[in-house]
């Protein structure tokens, strides 16, 4: 009987942990999506209908301006991202150079041995 009680309490604890983490994950993603207005690609018209003749789509300029107004720290973040991307690009070029040079060396060594 104690084994069944221990098993049931273990299952209950596991389910409570999963439920708690699931609720916390939903709350975090819900807050992000409700606060993020920069990803809205279509402006609602006054009638609620979208005409193809009217300009309801945000342009890149409007979207960039909206992002800068809502997230003033985004310029610094974009600069850091560009620096990181440049670093990654340089590392990939170095890796490609190393792999190509090793590939040629092993190919030339393989040809000499045969």
Curated annotation (Swiss-Prot):
Residues 1-4 are cytoplasmic. Keywords: Cell membrane, Glycoprotein, Membrane, Signal-anchor, Transmembrane, Transmembrane helix. GO terms for cellular component: plasma membrane. Signal peptide: none annotated. It is found in: Cell membrane. It is a single-pass type II membrane protein. It comes from the Eukaryota. Its main location: membrane. Glycans are attached at residue 84. Residues 23-114 are extracellular. Pfam families: KKLCAg1 (PF15204). The chain crosses the membrane at residues 5-22. InterPro entries: KKLCAg1. This is Kita-kyushu lung cancer antigen 1 homolog. It comes from Macaca fascicularis (Crab-eating macaque). The lineage of its organism: Eukaryota, Metazoa, Chordata, Craniata, Vertebrata.
């Amino acid at each position: 009987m104690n084994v069944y009680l221990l098993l049931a309490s273990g299952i209950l604890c596991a389910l409570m942990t999963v439920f708690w983490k699931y609720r916390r994950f939903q709350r975090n993603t819900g807050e992000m999506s409700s606060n993020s207005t920069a990803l809205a690609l279509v402006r609602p018209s006054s009638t609620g209908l979208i005409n193809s003749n009217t300009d309801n789509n945000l342009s890149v300029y409007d979207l960039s301006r909206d992002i800068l107004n809502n997230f003033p720290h985004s310029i610094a973040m974009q600069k850091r991202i560009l620096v990181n991307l440049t670093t990654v690009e340089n590392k990939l070029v170095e890796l490609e150079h190393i792999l190509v040079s090793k590939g040629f060396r092993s190919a030339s060594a393989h040809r000499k041995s045969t």
